[in-house]
Each structure stands twice: as structure tokens, then as C-alpha cells.
């Protein structure tokens, strides 16, 4: 295989991997949107399932990143800066998506923090201390006779 064919193969593989990473990031963005809705609704079962999916997606993204890094090194060796334009465009899109993920993740963390505070306040209000005694409960003695 000549150098041109090798360069083209590296370019194709890198584009394919970057496209797969973009798809995973799109899935992650959609998942973050669904998580935000679940947090607002207070649906813990959905949120738990989404957290499991999130862990899986993040693992997939990191695996792809491990494959992409060596391909990028080969790409930079094969193509001097500015000779090929599709890969830098894909990388810019991925960077933008990464920023959007950070923003949505921060928003979801804040929503979750607010929801947890609401639940804490609700629990505190349910545990109001001291409680009023019931009419049906026996009266508690309040004086002690120590003369005997």
C-alpha cells in the first residue's frame, strides 16, 4: 500500500471515528435533556435508568477518544495544516457539542440540587418537632411526688 492510499485510509478512519463520536455526543445531549425533564418531574426511576445510560455513553465516548487520539497523530503527520478541511470542521463541531454538554450538565446539577433541597424541606416539615399530643394518647405525668 502506497503512502497516498495509507493517507486516505487514515483520513477515512479518522472521519468515521469522529462521526461516531459526534453521534455518541448527540445521544448524550438528548439524554441530558431527558434527565432535566425527569428531575423536574421528580421521577426517580427514570432518572436512575438515565444515569445508568449516561455511564454507558461516557464509557463509549472515552473508548472512542482512545482510538481517535492515535489516528489524529497519524492524520497530522500525513496532512500538513490546512490541506484537508473536513476533519477540522468535525473537530470544531465536537468541541461545540462538548461545551453544550458541560452547560446542560451544570444546569441539570443545579436542578437536582434545587429538587433535593425541596425534598429536604418537605421531610423537615413532616418531622415537625414537638408534635401535638393526640386526644387519644394517655396523658404524660408532669409532676413527681418525692415525699414517699
What annotation goes with each model-predicted range?
Residues 84-148:
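Short terminal interaction segments
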Residues 2-81, 85, 89-92, 96-99:
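Extended, charge-rich alpha-helical scaffolding segments
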Amino acid at each position: 500500500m502506497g503512502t497516498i492510499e495509507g493517507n486516505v485510509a487514515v483520513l477515512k478512519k479518522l472521519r468515521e471515528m469522529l462521526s461516531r463520536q459526534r453521534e455518541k455526543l448527540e445521544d448524550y445531549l438528548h439524554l441530558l435533556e431527558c434527565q432535566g425533564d425527569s428531575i423536574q418531574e421528580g421521577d426517580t426511576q427514570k432518572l436512575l435508568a438515565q444515569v445508568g445510560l449516561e455511564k454507558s455513553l461516557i464509557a463509549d465516548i472515552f473508548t472512542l477518544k482512545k482510538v481517535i487520539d492515535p489516528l489524529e497523530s497519524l492524520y497530522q503527520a500525513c496532512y500538513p495544516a490546512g490541506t484537508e478541511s473536513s476533519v477540522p470542521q468535525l473537530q470544531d463541531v465536537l468541541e461545540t457539542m462538548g461545551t453544550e454538554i458541560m452547560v446542560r450538565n451544570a444546569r441539570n446539577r443545579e436542578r437536582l440540587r434545587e429538587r433535593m433541597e425541596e425534598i429536604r424541606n418537605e421531610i423537615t416539615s413532616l418531622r415537625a418537632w414537638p408534635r401535638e399530643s393526640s386526644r387519644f394518647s394517655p396523658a404524660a405525668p408532669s409532676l413527681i411526688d418525692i415525699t414517699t
